[in-house]
Amino acid sequence: MSRVAKAPVSVPAGVEVKLDGQLLTVKGKNGELTRTIHNFVEVKQDNNELTFSPRNDGAEANAQAGTTRALVNAMVIGVTEGFTKKLQLVGVGYRAQVKGNVVNLSLGFSHPVEHTLPAGITAECPSQTEIVLKGADKQLIGQVAADIRAYRSPEPYKGKGVRYSDEVVRTKEAKKK
């Protein structure tokens, strides 16, 4: 069995877990998340713990058990604490504004870029060059952050572009004559 899958997922107070066949629903103060569990994985619920085990002895079943455990743990953390992802805009004139569920970006193009946020994700701008994304679904937050970063990813000479706040951009040296 996978080392990750051996550890049970503890369900804190205030979180409701419902298992209906292969459909797992986790409900908490930050919302509700649903995921279909792979057929190779068996989930057991005992009081405030979820345990994951592979249905057979294959390598793929072991891998799926560990992956499923990690995803469900992220769901539980998401509905209790939530996840945040911070982006920085580096460059002259690069700005961001949030209006409702739309992030308006000025990234040096001849036109402003508007990115509509999916349901369950909120954004705020503490300053004109920072975007903070919040939500319960870890995968969705990461995808939205990657989509925004893709509009203008950091270039290797000056480092201008949209980057994650913890990202280190390695810069190249300019060509010498």
UniProtKB/Swiss-Prot annotation:
Q: Which Pfam families match?
A: Ribosomal_L6
- Could you tell me the superkingdom of the organism this chain comes from? Bacteria
The parts of the chain that form a coiled coil are: none
Instruction: State a GO cellular component annotated for this protein.
Output: cytosolic large ribosomal subunit
Question: Could you give the subunit structure recorded for this chain?
Answer: Part of the 50S ribosomal subunit.
Q: Its biological function?
A: This protein binds to the 23S rRNA, and is important in its secondary structure. It is located near the subunit interface in the base of the L7/L12 stalk, and near the tRNA binding site of the peptidyltransferase center.
To which protein family does this belong?
Belongs to the universal ribosomal protein uL6 family.
Per its record, how is this protein called by name? Answer: Large ribosomal subunit protein uL6
Name the source organism: Mannheimia succiniciproducens (strain KCTC 0769BP / MBEL55E)
Q: What is the lineage of its organism?
A: Bacteria, Pseudomonadati, Pseudomonadota, Gammaproteobacteria, Pasteurellales
Task: Give the gene symbol.
Answer: rplF
